[in-house]
């Protein structure tokens, strides 16, 4: 049995850093980590592996003289999906793609610009790529401020904004053109579907992100996403379902639905009706969830605002032990609870009724797990506001919570709000907030001891002989784990990555569960 406070050892691609890094549960991560992480988590397939796997399906990618593109991906899961899309197109065009600079003809850096620490990390990554390679194309959220990038790094070849896939491909083909010898061997359009509809994935083969929309219609004062990614732009429902089915066909066991505002899906399309599998289907949040629930694999919803119509979606959710369906899990970006702070943030309507809404969801589905992220130290936040938030947290008893201290973001309206909170007070409130949540989390996890749960295997630690898993209550990278022992019997490893197991919970810590697996019973 591992320690009750295990570190999650991860291997990530960090420009200029060692390949190994340590991160803890989200209570102890830096405040910004709730919104910013580097791509290439240790569970993830490397960019080389993913691109090579896809390239093996293409005749012309066997040419070793094809240009090599180094790729650095920074930011949130939505940015990771953008990276997957670009790498898919590059691979279809015959390029070799790798997650380093060695021997690359140029480097693409997909940046993050959400918070200042992310901006600085992106600028540092661009600088390192220029130093080590010299030919760099910049894309992603920070690309919106092209002048800032060019002022610091005038040698970059091209700068594009977020989800500017065609512009990136054009820039790559301009600065690293495909040799004519390879072009001459193309007897077909390189964009034809030589790669599965799901495309190249940088996540492990057993789970994948499914982005259903881009942009956001809200104008929260602390956020610059609309200026980086535009207003809400939903994918037609037939595209969403087509990718979901392709992911299932590829062996994916879990789909994580992401966007900036998942519950607003289809508003911009005016809930247009299309046809899927011979039946009419609306581009609408409820209809999409209803269809995804029938795909037959785990479906996890992220970035769901607490609108009243979410109640109907909760009614669709599966039971915790089910191995397919809409998981009883909601990731809700609440940000705060104090009415005055929510008003200053200009959060969407219905944010003030969240306690009642959460109670109703639990009445509909007692097994539902709710995760959220909060900001403390927002300009104008008083001690009274913070105490209100703490009391709200104690009543809400959320299952999974992340928190970060407010920091200014260039271009955000909140920068000009009066009464900024001193840094020392921000940090003190952060620690008090997480201390309360830690107690709530530990209490809720202790209630799981003695019960059986269905878990998905993310990793195998062969030295410790444990499987690092997740239950329906755990999203990858941001939530806890279920550590499972008894996976080796009679000298044989009984489980593998991507397996779903039924385990018995033996112990619990503040954020993780520890379980045992009975392979004999499972095979009976």
From Swiss-Prot:
Residues annotated as domain Radical SAM core: 202-443
Sequence ranges of Polar residues compositional bias: 20-31
Record's compositionally biased regions (Low complexity): 48-58
Keywords: 4Fe-4S, Cytoplasm, Iron, Iron-sulfur, Metal-binding, S-adenosyl-L-methionine, Transferase
Single GO MF descriptor: protein methylthiotransferase activity
UniProt-listed InterPro entries: Elp3/MiaA/NifB-like_rSAM, Methylthiotransferase, Methylthiotransferase_CS, Methylthiotransferase_N, Methylthiotransferase_N_sf, NA-bd_OB-fold, Ribosomal_uS12_MeSTrfase_RimO, rSAM
Any single GO BP term: tRNA modification
Cofactor: binding details: Binds 2 [4Fe-4S] clusters. One cluster is coordinated with 3 cysteines and an exchangeable S-adenosyl-L-methionine.
Main location: cytoplasm
Protein known as: Ribosomal protein uS12 methylthiotransferase RimO
